[in-house]
């Protein structure tokens, strides 16, 4: 249908970042609220220049037909999301565009009566779509940065089927850019925002936590119970160490790169002890502890029973490392990175990183070391 409409075969444009599903130039939803599934497709064509175009297709007489097309804001689609905030039941389309110069723009589209309208247009670094205010409808939070003004947060809430700007907030001036924005489910059932930002030094990341104060009806910075200076407490020195839901419980944990004091000895430069922290919890804040390989980009959770009682050293083989007893005499675990076809006596697979696999072998018996548990604690960073 799109080829017939354009008179040529277009180049489909895949988003470069996933918002939860597989990457696809097609997205489906009931855009106009008529109860039937519509489609949107992103493409570029020689006749219409370098910018991405978005076309809306409806089902007509058993076939797809293009009903509207609109030029996008840049040459690349970074992300695609949808939001159902209209009383009519229609769904709005959120598209993050990126230009070759690095500028990014978020467009919100509304489709009614076979007309695609751009109802919101904002520059952004990161955005998050979630019911932050507890209204029952998705809110839109946009982080942007401009030279001389630092990072700004804008909160848009859903009113009368539109996103309405309700707050602007200047963020910690020590951050120079936003590298990640995540919604995190708290113990109280409400959502917090976890922000990862580049620090002023340019060589480290740090984090901030934002929450919605229902009494003030505003987003503000959350004061962690156990940390008076969350910015400095969460500084880490690898771009791989971004916040994520490390244990799959809906809460996003912040990785804390920690020294070896009281935890054991670590003598391999590419490795680091990491504690994944939920600073919004009143009780158990450390959700996972283990070792991150910052060269190959993976994390391996270690059993709590080994914490403070081990040393981590280079292994006997290239790209391998070992977990030993604190005195170095007892070998508990060997971890190595190998080619896919390499096997070894006693080794089992932890996971894959690109075209390589990570294996482990348990040495002397330790009650807390079990293959299934170790494989379950393997995470690609």
What do the PLM-derived regions correspond to, one by one?
Residues 325-341:
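A short acidic-to-branched-hydrophobic micro-motif
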Residues 316-328:
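Membrane-interface alpha-helices
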Residues 361-362:
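A bilobed periplasmic-binding-protein/Venus flytrap-type ligand-binding module shared by bacterial periplasmic
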Residues 1-314, 321, 341-344, 348-353, ...:
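Beta-propeller-forming repeat regions
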């Amino acid at each position: 249908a799109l080829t017939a409409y354009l008179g040529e075969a277009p180049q489909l444009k895949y988003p470069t970042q996933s918002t939860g599903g597989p990457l696809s130039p097609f997205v489906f939803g009931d855009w106009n609220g008529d109860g039937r599934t519509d489609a949107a497709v992103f493409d570029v064509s020689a006749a219409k220049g370098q910018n991405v175009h978005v076309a809306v297709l409806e089902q007509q007489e058993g076939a797809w037909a293009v009903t509207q097309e609109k030029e996008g804001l840049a040459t690349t689609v970074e992300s695609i999301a949808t939001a159902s905030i209209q009383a009519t039941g229609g769904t709005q389309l959120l598209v993050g565009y990126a230009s070759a110069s690095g500028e990014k723009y978020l467009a919100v589209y509304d489709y009614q009566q076979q007309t695609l309208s751009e109802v919101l247009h904002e520059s952004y670094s990161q955005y998050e779509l979630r019911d932050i205010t507890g209204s029952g409808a998705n809110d839109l939070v946009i982080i942007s940065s401009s030279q001389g003004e630092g990072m700004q947060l804008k909160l848009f809430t859903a009113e009368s089927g539109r996103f309405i700007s309700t707050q602007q907030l200047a963020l910690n001036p020590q951050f120079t850019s936003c590298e990640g924005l995540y919604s995190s489910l708290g113990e109280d059932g409400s959502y917090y925002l976890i922000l990862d930002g580049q620090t002023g030094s340019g060589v480290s990341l740090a984090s901030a936590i934002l929450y919605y104060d229902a009494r003030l009806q505003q987003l503000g910075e959350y004061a962690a119970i156990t940390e008076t200076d969350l910015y400095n407490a969460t500084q880490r020195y690898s771009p791989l160490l971004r916040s994520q839901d490390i244990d799959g419980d809906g809460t996003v944990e912040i990785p804390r790169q920690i020294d070896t004091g009281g935890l054991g000895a670590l003598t391999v430069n590419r490795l680091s002890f990491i504690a994944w922290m939920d600073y919004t919890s009143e009780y158990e804040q450390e959700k996972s502890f283990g070792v991150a390989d910052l060269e190959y980009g993976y994390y391996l959770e270690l059993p709590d029973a080994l914490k403070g009682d081990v040393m981590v050293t280079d292994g006997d083989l290239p790209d391998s490392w070992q977990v030993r007893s604190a005195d170095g005499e007892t070998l508990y675990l060997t971890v190595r990175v190998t080619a896919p076809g390499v096997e070894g006596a006693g080794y089992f697979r932890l996971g894959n990183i690109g075209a390589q696999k990570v294996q482990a072998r348990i040495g002397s018996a330790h009650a807390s070391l079990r293959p299934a548990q170790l494989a379950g604690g393997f995470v690609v960073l």
